[in-house]
Amino acid sequence: MATPSGTATATTYLARDHARAQAGTEVDAMPVLPASRWPAPPEGVAAEDVVWAETVAGGNYTHKVLARGTELRLTDLTGDACAHLLLHCADRPWERLNVADTVKVLWNAYLGEGHLLLSDQGRVLASVTWDTSGRHDALTGTSSLARNTVRYGDGTPQSASPAGRELFKLAALKHGLTPRDLPPSVSFFQGVRIAEDGTTEFTGSAGPGGTVTLRAEQDVTVLLANVPHPLDPRPAYTCGNLGVLAYRARPTSPGDPLWEATPEGRRAFLNTADHLTARGIA
């Protein structure tokens, strides 16, 4: 988008006219409104069932409240995206993603298809129903202001190298949440592995086009920050566009293979169903 000259915005009226002239401008990274205008819904998904369609540039964030049963598809469009994710129960944000329980209860530190994202109440917030990347992280969290300041010279949200936690703070504010409401996060598309000696090894990206699909098992507030992984060794602040698409579907139910995949997962689904049934939701 061209930068306006001083004369183009010299008065309030000129500034208004200039702003209105940009109304039809589209850029690579922006939300699609309404989301049903998204040109390529997933196979079998009607356009009117698409509820969120957005491309998030590197160094930016987004957020949305999604209904139970909604599927959220994240796509690494360039091979350099890194989607840091937080989930809160939409109507009671004190119940939120607990990464420690997500790893511990399920006996698996590596996120992928079939993994459940658990709250501190032992309930399922979301399930991973599809994964073509295999490069994710539930161990190291997102970047901090201090770390980015040392690495890139700045980590504030308005800088060229914003930290993930600083962007999470802004996303949280949009939902009445404070920094105290931000637990450790998980991230997708830039992986880590734990070596035999206990050190954390950065495995990076699987390349452009990788996708992960999450299914909301309760009404959730989704916070996303698309920033470089804190262990990314590249000296420059490198992060590509992230595709975000959500559409109406159905929550996991008894008889679904995911429900019965593990004893721990089954218990988490039963905890979730018990809670929702008592509230008249399920």
Where do the model's predicted regions map?
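Intrinsically disordered, low-complexity segments enriched in small/polar residues
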Residues: 2-282
